[in-house]
Amino acid sequence: VNATLNMWNRLQPEVDLGMGWAKYCPDDKSFTYRGKLSPYARLGVNYNFLYKSDPAYKVFLGVKCGYSFFNYEITDVAYDNGYWSENGKFDIAGQKSHAVWGEFLVGLNVKLWRNISAGWQAKYHRLFNHKSNANSEPWYIPGFGPRNSNLAVTFNVCYTLPLCKDKWPKK
């Protein structure tokens, strides 16, 4: 869920709240990672470069800070000891973690029909801090995504609540 406040069509403070989860098993089936359904929040601001035009159209740069606390487990971890010719599997269950990250983004929104618009965002995000556990590190962070990628692209379809009855001046 995203809420944006349009301030003079130039600055747009924004809050994102959501839930994320993950399940991942590599091709060699050496383990299964399960991120439990967990909340995340992001808070930031966008600057609209088309502030002199219709508010339904935006080209913007933004910055956000995100936080999530989450649980995960890693099961069926396969190991092979070649020296002793031993192999087996074990689980790492009940792992808890949290993370803080920052994002820089560029985006575009266009009006499709009435109060419905669509757009995309490309963002660079970086972890500032995350809790590592004694036996594992989180692979997936809700709201951030996989830890091994700093770039992301999203596509959005939005509905604008008509809270203000004033019309934008026509030229």
Predicted feature locations:
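Gram-negative (and chloroplast) outer-membrane scaffold detector with strong preference
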Residues: 11, 15-83, 159
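Residues that define the transmembrane beta-barrel architecture of outer-membrane proteins
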Residues: 1, 35-41, 57, 96-102, ...
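Extracellular loop and loop/strand-boundary signature of outer-membrane beta-barrel proteins
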Residues: 26-34, 88-94, 140-145
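A contiguous pocket-lining binding segment that forms or flanks enzyme active sites
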Residues: 84-111
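Predominantly the C-terminal beta-signal and adjacent terminal strand-loop region
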Residues: 104, 110-171
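Transmembrane beta-barrel domains of outer membrane proteins
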Residues: 2-4, 46-48, 107-109, 158-160
